[in-house]
Design a protein with these regions (language model features):
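Compact, basic/aliphatic-enriched, mixed alpha/beta core segments that act as assembly/interaction modules
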Residues: 143-145, 149-210
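Catalytic DNA-binding helix-loop module of base-excision-repair DNA glycosylases/AP lyases
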Residues: 34, 38-39, 90, 113-159, ...
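N-terminal polyanion-binding entry modules of DNA glycosylases/AP lyases
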Residues: 1-111, 181, 188-281
């Protein structure tokens, strides 16, 4: 019988060497956590931080965000896939929270049981499984694994999830590989691997290893081989290493580079407050 807990720890140990630096420690109000999850799905931490900062600084306050058009909100997610879909979910979240509480606060979710909190999040239209699980794990500390599409692709390649599993199914499968206390660190390093632009194509569904070779007991050895091949290809192409940066694909199927650019977050605030109004010309 495969001891997935031990394999999960060994995987994290290997990924820490590949992607050095501390895993981010997120402490946000529940509403901000939910909005951040929308930024983070299928993106790198750097991209998510940039988009989240834009979200809080590009509009006068959260009410202006709530009443803005999808087109206006989508500009916040420039450089990420599915910008309109992210904008749609942001607006749905803000509509739900404001109409329920008549303010932009959602801290009551922390006081609910996992069952009741999950039911409440399901009432917000069009949230993804990742949005819900990230919020439940971050705000309530529950034993759920926030897994998005790219992370699922990587988990299947590793052999930790079965071929064809959806992110929701993979999240349940991965629980056996991670202790509750280790979920944030495990999820962070799995994300680093999943969005690495050198590797993301290797994890695409059509390129997954067969069931016979996608053995979780050999995943570290296979990963080390993949790292060497990807690094050699990058050196041959004259590219510098850029682990942890997400590959963003445009509508025509081409990849475009991503940076930490975009609007500077000149103003930040708690999700319940508002930034000072900008001067208008």
């Amino acid at each position: 019988m495969v001891d997935k807990l031990t394999l999960g720890k060994k995987l994290v140990g290997l990924l820490k060497k590949r992607y050095p630096g501390p895993s981010p420690h997120q402490e946000r109000p529940v509403l901000e956590t939910l909005l951040y999850a929308i930024c983070l799905e299928d993106a790198s931490v750097e991209q998510a931080e940039t988009c989240f900062a834009r979200l809080l600084s590009a509009f006068h306050d959260l009410n202006e965000l709530r009443v803005s058009s999808i087109t206006e909100l989508a500009t916040v997610f420039d450089g990420l896939a599915s910008a309109d879909w992210r904008a749609h979910r942001v607006r749905n979240v803000l509509h739900y929270v404001f109409e329920k509480n008549f303010e932009f606060a959602f801290e009551s979710l922390r006081r609910k049981t996992l069952e009741l909190a999950t039911k409440q999040l399901f009432k917000i239209r069009d949230l993804s499984p990742f949005d819900r699980n990230y919020t439940l794990q971050s705000a309530l500390g529950t034993h759920v694994i926030p897994v998005d599409r790219l992370m699922t692709n990587a988990a299947i390649w590793l052999g930790l999830a079965a071929t064809g599993e959806t992110p929701e199914q993979a999240a349940e499968t991965l629980k056996s590989a991670v202790r509750k206390a280790d979920v944030p660190v495990f999820a962070h390093y799995l994300r680093c691997l999943a969005v690495d632009p050198r590797l993301v194509k290797a994890f695409e569904p059509g390129k997954h290893a067969s069931a016979a070779t996608a053995d979780p007991q050999t995943m570290n050895e296979r990963l080390e081989t993949l790292f060497k091949e990807a690094d050699a290809a990058a050196r041959k192409a004259g590219k510098k290493p850029a682990p942890g940066r997400a590959a963003v694909r445009t509508a025509d199927g081409r990849e475009r580079p991503t940076g930490g650019g975009g609007s500077k977050a000149g103003r930040t605030r708690d999700a319940r407050g508002a930034a000072p109004a900008r001067k208008r010309k």
